[in-house]
Regions:
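Accessory beta-strand-rich segments of carbohydrate-active enzymes
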Residues: 3-16, 30, 46, 50-153, ...
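Short flexible loop/turn segments that cap and initiate beta-strands
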Residues: 179-181, 218-222, 624-626, 632-634, ...
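Beta-strand-rich binding/interaction modules
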Residues: 166-196, 203, 625-644, 666-671, ...
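Short, hydrophobic beta-strand segments
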Residues: 105-107, 205-214, 657-662, 755-772
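Active-site-adjacent substrate/metal-binding segments within catalytic domains
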Residues: 35-62, 66-75, 79-86, 92-95, ...
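Conserved structural position at the C-terminal beta-strand
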Residues: 121, 227-229, 671, 714, ...
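Substrate-binding clefts and catalytic carboxylate motifs of secreted carbohydrate-active enzymes
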Residues: 4-7, 11-15, 78, 126, ...
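Extended acidic/polar, glycine-enriched regions
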Residues: 110-112, 171-246, 663-664, 673, ...
């Protein structure tokens, strides 16, 4: 069937507010522009947004060629409880907000006249999530059309039979028997062709690709399968690669062991909200790749098609996850209400979305589902694993289990339950969402981590009852997902010699320990740090903040604050640390705890440091600075202005601390090997006296209708970043529109859809969409002065 984008010409209006219709282009997130309030029933979990119901409308006259054809609408993601209406007739309801679904509109279409398509997204049923969800049609919409003879949607499946010989299987489903032709293309070149006149509606073509270029994380080679059936032509991109998993070899791609250096990500795209713009999804993948990660976990819901396309192109592995809750509510209105009736359809749709993507290397059925401590939950774990194996026998299945939490849950501490979720929600509603309430579930667990630290959590996971409450579920999956269970690894490898262990959620500070264990032990498949890029919601989880950036009102907290990459896409010093700890960069690298601060931020279990990669603290001369040197070399030495301030044996954690007085001169770290020879050096430079606002686009040119990410940064006259410079910036755009604006501060008054922002450590980010003209102009004014800074970007 032919696919056509159906994203232009929509309007949206609130069903719970008083706003009129607005013209929008999909994808669109209605929540991101809503007001934030202490009255939010979702509270900090969703960034203090209110939530609401919205109606999207598209009026169109169907093309004459659609008449007599099969016509399907595809919604890649609508949050949530989506209703689809055509010309006043309700055609579909889909409760889950993260799965793509299809609606047959053929019989409802009226030809030769205007048709009215309505989609209702209901998100006023708060609370329904533990993180920011967005509202509305936040992923693209497509229309699929096909004649009498056609290849149905998802009718082509491709997998690798033998990577050594380049043999692939192309399974083709057609509407009726007939001739099917398959061409394999490498770029524009046809490298293999096969055709067959079939008497069946499902045909398997086994094809040898000559001199096959394999797909892996370092060489993401892609081919295209062009399948023809009558007048219908379908093209599917794929990679030639096989997966295998066992305790002898670990997880292998094309016969070579791969250790997952992973990061957990939520689905939002920062200032854009939940919108799954292809440019934003690709940027997210690229940023993780640049910072040493080779895998992502789509926490805790199925990811978008756009991010999978980016993973395929860039060589990033993906573990696609199904749901955050199964049978016990974590919030009053979460997906538990519908899961028992929809889980098979949801998993089927997730697999069909993922199957041809070489980047998808595993499925996860859930996250921190305490049901896995009980017999009925263990049984359900097995049912889902077996069902996924039936749908796709080529990939392993996992589930992220919070080991300590399973034990606590089993003795009634912090356990999720329908009754507690109901009680908490009703109490919050009566008191406007601002009451101090007794935490349950993950909120209870997160507060324990903040109060007691990560060691308490990791020690708790080693207790004997934790083993009793997890081993049943682990026996019903291929990869045992350990959330915060790294201190169990060595013991469990001996106790369960046939178990493959995956660190499905881990702390940043344990990167060095994971890597040291995994390198020598194939049963340790990999690690997914919480979290990769920062995200909206789950406020305060890892947000240590100094007083002058911290706001006292709870509702000003916007993000989790625990990303190794901040919400603007800038790497934090923690990401520099993990690059070295995971041996993806030799180092040394340097982080410096802000020199001008005398107060101490409250670090949580998900925080390692507030250090920044800068030595430009103008006005702080003589103040004591804490310098962090990231290196795995035996020894490191720190030089200030060419003078040694000390040589130290490197910490086993790959993070060695020095105390030095701040001076405005070069700060250099030198690493030495076991023989005392220099094996690496790194220098941070001070800043000059002049302060300049620079507009730095990530893209030299923009496509018409495409997105651009533009960093606003205070530097000196030579371009050296000045983290202590601060101002309120007002942004205007000509030849396009401003989609989002903000800084990396976890505390935000208002939202990301205004035209002004405070800077955070001297930086902010603007996200723009180019118009149809030949250039986009961005203008920035500082509150502290009348001077305007401008930049023009060509649009092609």
């Amino acid at each position: 069937m032919k696919k056509t984008a159906f994203n232009e010409g929509w309007t949206v209006r609130s069903l719970t507010g008083d706003s009129g219709e607005r013209q929008v282009t999909l994808p669109h997130d209605a929540m991101i522009s809503e007001p934030r309030s202490p009255e939010s029933r979702g509270e900090g979990n969703i960034g203090w947004y209110i939530g609401g119901d919205y109606e999207y409308t598209k009026r169109f006259t169907p093309p004459a060629e659609w008449e007599g054809q099969n016509v399907l609408l595809e919604f890649e993601g609508v949050y949530h409880n989506a209703e689809v209406w055509m010309n006043g007739e309700k055609l579909a309801f889909r409760p889950y907000g993260y799965t793509n679904f299809y609606v047959d509109i053929r019989e409802a279409l009226k030809f030769g006249e205007e048709n009215e398509l309505k989609v209702i997204a209901r998100n006023s049923d708060q609370p329904n999530s533990r993180w920011y969800t967005g509202t509305g049609i936040y992923r693209p919409v497509n229309v699929w059309t096909g004649g009498e003879k056609y290849i149905p949607v998802n009718g082509v499946r491709i997998d690798t039979e033998d990577y050594r010989e380049g043999i692939i299987n192309v399974k083709v489903r057609v509407s009726e028997p007939g001739e099917i032709r398959v061409e394999i293309l490498d770029g524009e070149e046809t490298v293999a062709v096969k055709s067959h006149i079939s008497s069946k509606e499902l045909v398997n073509f086994q094809i040898r690709v000559p001199d096959a270029k394999l797909w892996d994380t370092e060489h993401p080679n892609l081919y295209t399968a062009r399948v023809s059936f009558g007048d219908d032509v379908v093209e599917e991109t794929f990679g030639i690669r096989t997966l295998a998993w066992n305790t002898t070899d670990g997880l292998t791609i094309n016969g070579k062991r791969v250790i997952l250096r992973g990061a957990c990500i939520h689905h939002d795209n920062g200032f854009l909200g939940a919108c799954a713009f292809p440019e934003a999804e690709e940027r997210k993948v690229r940023l993780h790749k640049e910072n040493g990660y080779n895998a992502l976990r789509s926490a805790h819901n199925p990811c978008s098609k756009a991010i999978l396309d980016a993973c395929d192109r860039l060589g990033m592995l993906m573990m696609d996850e199904f749901a955050d809750a199964w049978t016990m509510h974590k919030t009053k209105y979460d997906y538990v209400t519908y899961l028992k009736d929809w889980w098979k359809q949801d998993l089927k749709d997730m697999v069909e979305k993922d199957y041809n993507h070489p980047s998808v290397i595993a499925y996860s059925t859930g996250n921190e589902v305490a049901e896995t401590a009980r017999p009925e939950g263990i049984a359900f774990t097995g049912r889902m694993t077996r069902y996924l194996h039936k749908l796709d026998p080529t990939r392993p299945v996992s589930c992220g289990i919070n080991i300590f939490f399973n034990f606590l849950s089993s003795i009634g501490l912090g356990v999720y339950s329908d009754e507690k979720a109901e009680k908490e929600s009703d109490a919050a509603a009566k008191k406007g969402g601002s009451q101090k309430k007794k935490p349950v579930g993950s909120e209870f667990y997160n507060q324990l981590a903040c109060l007691m630290g990560d060691k308490f959590m990791k020690f708790g996971a080693t207790l004997y009852p934790c083993d009793l409450k997890t081993r049943g579920a682990y026996a019903n999956m291929d990869l045992a997902g350990y959330n915060y269970g790294i201190w169990r690894y060595k013991k469990d490898m001996k106790k369960y010699p046939n178990r493959l262990i995956l660190g499905s959620e881990t702390f940043c500070k344990d990167a060095w320990l994971f890597w040291d264990i995994a390198k020598e032990n194939p049963p340790i498949v990999g690690d997914f740090v919480w979290a990769g890029m920062d995200y909206i919601g789950e406020t305060g989880m890892g947000a240590p903040e100094y007083g002058d950036y911290k706001m006292t009102e709870d509702e000003t907290q916007m993000t989790g604050g625990n990303g190794r990459i901040d919400i603007t896409g800038k790497r934090r010093a923690e990401a520099a640390y993990t690059l070295v700890a995971l041996e993806q960069e030799e180092g040394p690298l340097i982080g410096v705890q802000p020199v001008d601060r005398t107060d101490k931020p409250g670090l949580t279990g998900w925080s390692l440091t507030k250090a920044v990669e800068s030595w430009a603290f103008n006005g702080c001369e003589g103040m004591k600075a804490t310098v962090e040197v990231y290196s795995r070399a035996p020894k490191v030495e720190l030089f200030l202005g060419g003078r040694s301030v000390g040589r130290k044996k490197t910490s086993k954690t790959a993070r060695t601390l020095f105390k030095v007085p701040y001076e405005a001169c070069d700060l250099t770290a030198v690493a030495y090997d076991a023989s005392g020879n220099e094996c690496g050096r790194y220098t941070l430079k001070p800043a000059g006296g002049e302060t300049v606002l620079r507009i730095i686009p990530e893209e030299e040119t923009l496509k018409a209708g495409g997105l651009g990410f533009i960093r606003l940064r205070f530097t000196d006259e030579n371009g050296v970043w000045k983290p202590l410079a601060r101002d309120i910036l007002k942004v205007s755009v000509a030849g396009g529109e401003l989609l989002g604006l903000g800084s990396a501060n976890s505390y935000v008054r208002g939202n990301y859809t205004t035209d002004s922002t405070d800077t955070y450590y001297g930086e902010a980010l603007a996200i723009v969409r180019a118009g149809a003209g030949d250039e986009l102009k961005i203008s920035v004014t500082q509150r502290s002065g009348s001077e305007m800074t401008e930049l023009r970007i060509p649009v092609i």
